[in-house]
Amino acid sequence: MYIAMNRFRVLLDRRQDFEQMWLSRESRLPEVPGFVEFHMLKGPEREDHQLYSSHTVWRTYEDFVAWTKSDAFRSAHARAGNNNTPTMMAGPSEFEGFHVIQEVKSDGSKKVIAAE
C-alpha cells in the first residue's frame, strides 16, 4: 500500500473558497486502477494560514506512479492553477509519499507489510 499526501497552507480569508473548490470538483479517481480511497483533511489553524492535506491511498506504489502518467491525472491537475488557486495559498503545496509498513485494523488484526 502507498499513501500520497499533499499539504496545503491556505490563507485564512480563503478557507471557504479552498474547501468549496475541493468539495465541488469532479473526481475520476474511482476509475483509476489501484485507487483505494481519498480524504481531504483540515488541520490546525496557524497565525497566517489553515493547514489542509489531501490523503490518497493506493494499492501499490506502482499504481500511484501509473496514475501520475494518466489522462485522469492530467485532467485533475490541469485545473490546479485555475480558480485563483495561487491567491488562496500561503506558499506552494508540498508532496509527501509513504510506503505502508504496518497495518492495524479495528478488529485487532495486525499486518506487517514488507517495505518496498
Spans of features found by a protein language model:
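Glycine-rich beta-strand-turn "strand-cap" elements at beta-sheet edges
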Residues: 2, 39-48, 78-116
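Active-site-flanking beta-strand signature of metal-NTP-handling nucleotidyl enzymes
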Residues: 3-8
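Serine/threonine-rich low-complexity intrinsically disordered regions
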Residues: 14, 60, 70, 105-107
